[in-house]
Amino acid sequence: MQPNNFHTSSDTGELIATFRQGKAFLIFGLILAVVFLGLAAFVFYLSTIVPMGDNGPVTLHTSRGMTMNFASQDVVFSFTTGLLALIGLCLLGTTAWHKKLRNTDYEVYGNGIVRITKDQRDYTAFAEIEDLYLFSSGQTVLTGLITNLAYRRNASEPFHRVIDTLKDFQAFQELVRDLHVRARLPAVAEALEAGQSVTFNCISSKQVWGKRVTGSFLKVTTAPILLSRDFFEYQGNRVPVSSLRTVDLNAWTENVVIKDENGKPVLSTIATGILSHDLFLSTLDVVLAVEEQARKPAANVFEMNVR
């Protein structure tokens, strides 16, 4: 992707919304870091003016019954100063790290998304995004709540990750998902109508859960899902579309399960493990609707279902 790759309004469509990074956490973290560093400086100053008196061992008892022994009052002051300074520096480092994570804003247009980092603007059309990846991280990682969105044109380029520090992140990800389906579905339906198959990349459920533990979310290994008017194929198992009967989405298990006419699962995986899974489900709806209407006269069944 080239720097300052920004297209004209006729290419991008109308600007729908601008999403910026929240600053409250950064401000709070900076203030807290300054407070702890200030306290460290104050305690150090006290150590230079407070008379030490008997410079023997000092024993401190905490409210939880913990006992701390120090060789002298000087050591107490040094320990307290060092601890406060360490906390302050850790807070400062954490704030700097989060600032780096939050240095990108986004503009969502009718036809694409603009990533803004300082003075650089990079545009990606929704129609070019093959992989839209949704996943959970942080404190909500075990709940499956979507707190991250990543996108790429294809597997040859890295993912661009958007985290929930973005203001109104949930509105952002819902808008991007909707516009992505609108942009991609007509071309996908056209390919199916021409007798071609379309490919969706899938991350196994085992891998999804593993990444929730390890945190290496963007290093993924995918397996293709092939879908055409005639067949559905995953992990070498090809079945006729005419044999597919139900598509179940379970909010509790996060799974999408596709079963054949005998009730046997053809695909069972975590929904968000399917990259561009909204487009996948919409495409599958079109294919199954066409199959149901196969005996009905229609000038253009695919076009009707896309509309």
Feature map (PLM): residue ranges:
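Transmembrane-cytosolic junction motif
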Residues: 48-55, 89-112, 116-118
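N-terminal recruitment modules of adaptor/scaffold proteins
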Residues: 97, 109-114, 145-146, 150-238, ...
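N-terminal membrane-targeting/pre-transmembrane regions
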Residues: 1-74, 121, 127-194, 198-202
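Short, exposed beta-strand/loop patches in secreted or surface proteins that constitute
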Residues: 6-8, 105-108, 222-227, 246-249, ...
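Canonical hydrophobic alpha-helical transmembrane segment
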Residues: 36, 77-94
